[in-house]
């Protein structure tokens, strides 16, 4: 499957308010195809690519800052394992309240995982556009731009979000938000919930992109690691989809 189709699928699986924040892959491809070798064409491409990278970076930073604030404030539920255990214990007879606690945690975790996949697929998209540009023009933009993204752009530096994902998963495990021994019907019910469903679908798309990509080298991202959660890991695809 071509990368453009997988990107389209990833965009459709993202949150609605995120869908205009992805790399403008189709438009950038059109600009590359129209380059005739003139300085004006090259300048137009560089300007369009820079604007797209700025858009991606600003959105990632905005979301990361929001997640840090939510994580520190532990809202809408205090993400503290002891408090969470106590809340669930007190709500043992209130199924709706327990379900609400679980859903809030799963949603927060899912939004952060979606941001990690957003970072990955946009970096890959930028890399593929640069590769197409260099192939068409004989230029050498890919290496310096990839280096600049890795060193200076926020959307490639995912350590903070990854740490919060791991901490959230630890709370989920301790509080038995969705136990490993949960029945299949419980997993299926969770998968039908909006953000959780989108998260699983986005992870599967990213696995397809990573496993099937023919683009490997010093400018490639490291392999995507799925969150260490049995209930997400169980949704991994059995085989890769080839990327063109």
UniProtKB/Swiss-Prot annotation:
Start and end residues of each stretch annotated as Disordered: 212-244
InterPro entries: SPX_dom (IPR004331), SPX_prot (IPR031142)
Domain SPX: 1-147
Annotated disulfide bonds: none
Residue ranges of coiled coil: none
Pfam family, one: SPX
GO terms classed as biological process: cellular response to cold; cellular response to phosphate starvation
Name this protein carries in UniProt: SPX domain-containing protein 6
Organism: Oryza sativa subsp. indica
